Amino acid sequence: MLDVALRNLAFAYDRGFALRDVTLTFARSTHTALIGPPACGASTLLRLIAGALKPSAGDVILGQRRVNDVKASARPLLAVTAAIDVPGRWSVQHVLVAAVHTRTLDREDRHREYELAVDKWSLGPLLDRKMRTLSDTEAVRVQLARIELLRPAVLLADRLLERVSPSARTQLADAFYRTMRVSGTTVISAPCSTDELAYTDRVVVLHEGNVVQSGVAAEVFARPASDAAAIATGDVDVIPVVVRGNTVESVIGAWEVDPPPFQGSGVALVRPSDFTPPAPGEDSDFVFGVEEAGFAGGRWIAHGMLTGGVRLRVELPREANVHKGRLMALRYDPARFRLLPRELAPLQPTVPTDVVPPLGETR
């Protein structure tokens, strides 16, 4: 299998640079996810590696070979999306047979791999169906079987699972990425959800065409270098803060930090799961007013507005008594927060929750 290297890679559209000075190495037989906010440059980077776009500067290296001038069809890789690149009139069987026939196997081995793929991806009842008659999830299952049969050295997957039903996505992702790991394929993906980060060896965070952070997904989640890195790895609340000495002041209370990471204004990047209801007898850190609440994924998700128009999203255990309009006492561990310096405008008072006029002024 092959490793992939990018050296000072840049690409510009007419409106400006989409990627700037990207230098990365993707080790062979590993899975790296390119993540970031919308228009971060992940899909553009995959297209540059695939050969669908030509770099404005820098090099793409596959193994030991610089491939900038090598046609996309001649590069030893496979680039895929959720849309399978075969005629809609083809049957599922035709797609799979065409894939396995690209391999240098004898007839018996080809037939065995074909049968294993059909069974693994539950495609038996679909073999005679034409591709254009399949549901989105069925078509993606065919795509995954096809990729397994092609056995690419390098796989570039751009939102491969975005059309899969949410109820089937986790199961298919687990089966597919384990298959790629066993086969030794070097996978570079732009995932369609943060759930897919569970199957990666590393994530690379892109923002406005620049690499802003890379590392193991758990490390980036816990210590994001920016809002972009925090958002790319999970839900996040951005809470304005002011650091004075060793004290951090915010709309959810104040806490001590030693040593302080900066002085003056900034933000705290806070995960919704960092908040918990106090146990009986425990003090709370602040009171949260629930404006909207819903139940999903085995927990409550509540939204509310704090002083100065700061919106807060919290995740609460399923046994919590959560409903619209309820005031809830919450606790947090500030050691879990990520503090970043930032110039901020003063918070604007909100009415009527935060500013109550004197009684005489209301008459």
What spans do the regions from the language model cover?
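Conserved ABC ATPase "signature" C-loop
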Residues: G209-N210
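Conserved ABC ATPase "signature" region
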Residues: D109-L126
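ABC ATPase "signature
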Residues: S214-G215, R223
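Helix-to-loop junction immediately C-terminal to a conserved catalytic motif
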Residues: A50
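ABC ATPase NBD coupling module
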Residues: R66-L78, T102, V220
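Glycine/charge-rich catalytic "coupling/switch" loops of P-loop NTPases
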Residues: I252-G294, A320-R363
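Q-loop/switch helix immediately C-terminal to the Walker
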Residues: R89-T102
